[in-house]
Amino acid sequence: INHQSLIATKASRVVCAAKGDGIMEFGLRRAQGPDAGVYGARAAMIGGCIGTSNVLAGQLFDVPVKGTHAHSWIMSFPDEYTAFKTYANMYPDACCLLVDTYDTLKSGVPNAIRVFEEMRNAGIPLKNYGIRLDSGDLAYMSKQARKLLDAAGFDDAYISASSDLDEYLIESLKAQGCKITSWGVGTN
């Protein structure tokens, strides 16, 4: 029970720091074994997280499974655009594209916008879509990404972030005026 209490408490602190933004539990890869990952995800949900990246925990506890693809997904394709397009075709109802594998502002966000435009032009409803930032100056990158998305007519696209986040970093990013509205937390 100590492990789960610790995770639930930490999740609660992170949720409070996010001030209404959604927190997704991304802790499986850092868990001390599969059981710790499953029960840690459950504890994070008790602490206020809106979903988990842990598919088994989602099945066992009937909680929402949320997340995006990894950098390795993008690197397994000949180029970033093809990776994004393939992912969007597989998950048109929940399309979140990880835009910082190569160059966030010069290729990642522009390629995401290209895919979103193609989805819109094909008549695919854009309801739950956005981008994820996982490195760099998250406050700056989110502000610049928001400008690019808005200029392209995707002002309802969300910006999610991960990257060793905890309640203190989330508070700092919010104080800097970041444009992030959902957070993937698990390393810390």
Task: Briefly describe each language-model feature range.
Residues 95-97, 159, 183:
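Hydrophobic/aromatic residues located in beta-strands of well-ordered beta-sheets
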Residues 163-164, 181:
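Conserved acidic functional residues
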Residues 173:
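Hydrophobic alpha-helical positions that pack around
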Residues 176:
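Conserved dinucleotide-binding and phosphotransfer motif residues
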Residues 1-155, 165-169:
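Buried, small/hydrophobic-residue-enriched core segments of structured protein domains
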Residues 71, 162, 186:
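Residue-level "edge-of-site" marker
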Residues 179-188:
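Glycine-rich phosphate-binding active-site loops on the catalytic face of alpha/beta enzymes
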